[in-house]
């Protein structure tokens, strides 16, 4: 058995694309080898400057293959049959027949001879390289090949020899290169073992997983050495492993003056911009240290540390300057600047949006002064220096500025959390923050729908589906007894619009169905859904439990039987007890009369479980009615009266849910 070693050596591959490339090339090569009857064990390694394929257990020759090719039916015109024979260079006598769906077809068995693997590998490799689709790729120079970054070299060795491979302007060889900064020299290799060893000798760790383990171990060791804690950050570890060929973890210091910055600012400066790891003391407070990953082993590590400390100090100095500039002004004093910030070309500026949000909050919770204050100030930090530098800190900086001004925690927290939830995995805000988040998201969604930005099958540029789910989650997880239909009407009035109500309510209904269908049957959802979402969820849960029980199943069957008897007939008029001629119909009507007011009261109290239990009292008399009474009596008055009785029962059930949809 033979082995194949392929290295695509390039300029720096973006770290966030490396893992996908590793998985993508592994799948592609595995599939293409299998399709070519080459059954090999395939491994792919990825790093900042190289993607490496290592395949083992390759045979030296392919096994003979047989492929059965279907031709025309035996009843086809002779010209079609001759054309098939000509296309495959065979005579009609060489064809076999096979019965498919009671029809005989001609078949030709195509046989391929065994071939040396090294003859077919170049074509397979080029096909596999081209098959992977990068999220972004580029041409460079006058070359005709396209890749994520300019390719500089291709190493390709099969069975100890260079495989004659041509990819664009590059010809395969047996050369690789060491670490770009410390050992950037040509390395001749003979096989995979030699390749991996020489890379390691020249400060390149081939395996991404191994680089990540080195980083994890280094982070923990240095954190423990200072008696500090480090928060687990798998995503950042993966990213820095994609930035370094030979990771070395080092410890730097932060000047004490910078610790007066909010911790989110420190984290944003260090993690997002510098790819540094934050450290905390045992009480959870920010420690004046940071960890970073150096790309390579350098003789003077202290110089590397000082350089990184200097870079971080410069960034934090800017942040501290912005912070002090910001706290010199109140949030209210920034409101005028919001007039210069466009929310949407058709919807006005952020100052106008603030007025809408405030009006909605006042509609939801009249006389809630803290909520109204938070609503008026919730967007002020968007025109601050700090949020201009760190957009992800919107809301968070508003919280700190509100606290600095002396506003209470309820107001500050509402400003901070009013963007929540920002996705399915994000938590929902509570208290005033939930009401403010609801008002903000609702105003955005209603306004953007009016502006013609409704989602389509091809896109949702303003993430309105996510906004709607956020609103639904806020209402349900906070058990807000609000009618979304009323809120939509009120929000539309703020834009002087009422024409788009049906569009928006339909959109919310579809999103509510999407939300509920993870837990409930779609038929049940269709039977109870309205835009009082808390009530809808309560009905769903109650009905789901009830319909599992025997009584629930029997009641549903009784409803369907009554509904089928009524059919499309329009039943009018009250039930006339004097027309009853049988005991079962008298008994049924008596139960209906007795339980109806109790059911109506239970529904008004949202006690749906009691209402359903009361409906269960219908089971015995309605079964007797169906067994012993002819509904469509020859006397039309009697028939109409019995139909009216069944209609009453159906209407009673439909007060809880649309049973005709179950």
Curated annotation (Swiss-Prot):
Keywords carried by this UniProt record: Aminoacyl-tRNA synthetase, ATP-binding, Cytoplasm, Ligase, Nucleotide-binding, Protein biosynthesis
GO molecular function terms noted in the UniProt entry: arginine-tRNA ligase activity; ATP binding; glycine-tRNA ligase activity
Reaction equation(s) it catalyzes: tRNA(Gly) + glycine + ATP = glycyl-tRNA(Gly) + AMP + diphosphate
One of the protein's GO biological processes: glycyl-tRNA aminoacylation
EC number: 6.1.1.14
Record flagged with keyword Membrane: no
Residues spanning the membrane: none
Domain of life where this protein originates: Bacteria
Chief location of this protein within or outside the cell: cytoplasm
Quaternary assembly: Tetramer of two alpha and two beta subunits.
NCBIfam families for this protein: glyS (TIGR00211)
HAMAP family: Gly_tRNA_synth_beta
Name recorded for this polypeptide: Glycine--tRNA ligase beta subunit
Encoding gene (name): glyS
